[in-house]
Amino acid sequence: MRQLVRRGTHLGLLLAAFWLPTSPALAQEEKPIHMCPGCLAPVFTEQGKGSITPYGRIEIDAIYSSGNTNPLDPAQFNGYATAAGPNRNNTSTLNPRYSVFGIRGERTDGANSLLGVVEADFYGEKDVAGSVLPRLRLAYAKFSRKNYSLTVGQDWTPVMALHPDLIDFSILGYGGNLWQRIPQITFRYQFNENLEGLLTVLRFERGLYAIGGQRQVRPSAAPAGSGQGDAPFNDSSNDAFSDPIQHPYYGTRFAYNKDGKMLAVSAAYRYYRSAPAPGLTPGGFGSGGFTSGRDINSYLVGTEVVYPLSKTLKFSGELGYGQAIGQEFFRFGQDLNLTTGKPIRTLMGWGQLSWAASRKHTFLAGAGFDNPNDRDVQGSTANAGTQYKSNHRTYLTAIRPIWSDFYVGLEWQHLWTTWAVTTGPQHYQGDTYNVSFWYNF
């Protein structure tokens, strides 16, 4: 009992030290303040000196693609990530959507520092007039003190954090690179000059609801003419509140850096119990064939490496293995078999050689792969253009500044995709060619 009392007293003192003034003199100097969570005006302006810096990128991408290349989410124009079919209707486009505008706010008193970033691109859906709309890209605050930091808000995925350098805006998505910009709470700790570790929780705001027609929703009272236990239809106003995923991902990463070399290991996990997908016709996903009520253990383990081969040549890459890995890692629609509801296990990875031939010339050569377990995707007959048995990509890239921070880049990509269909041809190939101009300011 005495030990419990002592522990309780110690905890109380710690809480008091956090919430209460540190000295009577300080308490007399500082007046109480009514703080408002929704207010925008800064209050503690005397704590450190700050600055605000606008920044951004203006970009135009001229893209030519064979009819065999296709974005898996065309509404988002997220790059040409798969080889879609036998059609040879080649296409071209001029795309300004990868332009970015951001504001960075910083404050420090020498011991503590704050960094706030709000950043937007233009990959939002078009309005009724066909205008390109801005979309939230990053919005986070980072507090740092001594050898630790706390990041809260929407930032890049903190696990499997290494990415290739190619121009394509899918960043090798569906092709072995696991990435996303996602809401998170991440604590980082610097053990020494070379070793850093982190703990994180992360998830999309709307979970599976973000996938449109592939989303799951909990069963509700059956409307007239439908079966008991069917999921609500796509236009249900309750869908956003019926997401079966309640847990975020819980993740960790340890990275060792020295002399330009880096080795990192990552792991992430979450659990949920699957719910029905919106009912379509039997044989497709939905109440006709999608088996819900499964215990879904979604996990990811992986490693990342950067290794300089010479002063001008560098290798980087990553290798990951996981189950039920979906939109949180830019694998929309690849987490569960859309016909059976079974979680899909996947081996993924990529590698890249970067050659800095001179101060004004950089050349890249890389390849990536995403190979779901064939037994897990077996029987997936719905959305044959969505779920694949394998998806591979290679690329060659050249980058050169024209003047100052105005650049031109050339890129070629070749894609191989084997679709998870049971009849007809399954394997297709395609190419894309990209000429990009961008100005970083």
Q: For each of these PLM feature ranges, what is it?
A:
Residues 1-36, 224-226:
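Cleavable N-terminal export/targeting peptides
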Residues 25-77, 361, 400-406, 441:
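Outer-membrane beta-barrel biogenesis signature
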Residues 256-392, 396:
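Detector for outer-membrane/organellar transmembrane beta-barrel domains
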Residues 41-74, 84-209, 213, 246-262, ...:
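Outer membrane beta-barrel
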Residues 113-124, 203, 265-271, 362-371, ...:
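Transmembrane beta-strand segments that form the barrel wall of outer-membrane beta-barrel proteins
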Residues 96, 134, 180, 245-249, ...:
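Membrane-spanning beta-strands of outer-membrane beta-barrel proteins
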Residues 400-402, 427-441:
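Outer-membrane beta-barrel "beta-signal"
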Residues 28-36, 70-99, 103-145, 159-173, ...:
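Surface-exposed loop and membrane-interface regions of Gram-negative outer-membrane beta-barrel proteins
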